[in-house]
Amino acid sequence: MEQKMTNNHITIGILAHVDAGKTTLSEAMLYSTGQIRSLGRVDHQDAYLDNDAQERERGITIFSKQARLDISRGTNAADTARTADVARTADTARTWHVVMLDTPGHVDFSAEMERTLQVLDYAILVISATDGVQGHTRTLWRLLKHYNVPTFIFVNKMDMQGTDAEKVQAEL
């Protein structure tokens, strides 16, 4: 773990069950770090990382995609977005080079997702507050534990009508 903290190259995977908002989170991370100029949306078929024709047509991630986020240390996301060009040329000791892997959430593409687990330094497990913890979520958790991947849990869609925060917390 200490080696990960001193290394400025990190690989993070974003994993979730289908429709949890994984690609939306990826888009927000890309946008807030200045890597893309506008937010894409799955339902508008313009998500940056879902660029395969089948993915756009079906509205799901089929193939794992990667994007690089260069984040200057000691700045917040808004500062990073405004200084994205500076961050790319900044002293590498002051910049985190994060490779973000957006993985498929549909169970039919689990093999594609599982290939990425062995290279992850960290994972973000996205859970939809409207759907709660799904069977696929439990499978992902077991796989992350098996590969000893430190994991952040991100509960998405908390602002949606009908969300029961206490129920989701109990499921977690």
How does the language model describe each region?
Residues 2-79, 91-127, 131-133, 140, ...:
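P-loop NTPase switch module centered on the Walker A-proximal segment
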Residues 157-172:
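GTPase G-domain guanine-specificity segment
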